[in-house]
Amino acid sequence: TITKLVQELVEENIVTDNGKVETPGGRRPNIYGLANSAIYFVGVNVGRDFMGYVVTDLQNNIILEQMDPTFELLDRPQCLDRICTNIEEFVSSCGVDRGKILGLGVCMTGRVNPTTGRSYKYFTSSEESMREIIEERVGIRTLFENDTRARCYAEYSCGKAKDENDMLYLHLG
């Protein structure tokens, strides 16, 4: 039955029981929701002279955040390999079960094509897109975006501008 399946999901900490709802008549229904610990997301910021990493839960709570100030973005195969290795190491050491990570978002400096997952400046000689290479190496569904666009969207959806109808985002740097 549905009740039994939902109870199993509650016991596995995938779903939370948020209590009953008042109704004008009849049996009061229970409200269920996804548990914060059911799904996680990894974000990676590839800058010119750093890499930043973050793991968040369903409520955008930051579980872990790290910065690598020793990274230098160069248009060489070794650099793409280092990006993949750094992401693999972060995912392996972040303390979250890999099976609970729903997606990996990678934002990168410079012009990028989020649809194809390619940078117009870096790693252009590869037949596979940067997104495809990272996704294959790390084993997690990967989205690829320009860093300014990603920051703007984050500010609009869950930052200081989340309650605004209109906004202008300037990235100076």
Label the predicted regions.
Residues 70-166:
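Glycine-rich phosphate-binding loop and adjoining helix at the ATP-binding site
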Residues 1-17:
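N-terminal helix-turn-helix
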Residues 28-65, 168-173:
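Gly/Thr-rich phosphate-binding beta-strand-loop-beta motif of the actin/hexokinase/Hsp70
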Residues 17-39, 144-167:
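Conserved phosphate-binding catalytic cores of ATP/NTP-utilizing and phosphoryl-transfer enzymes
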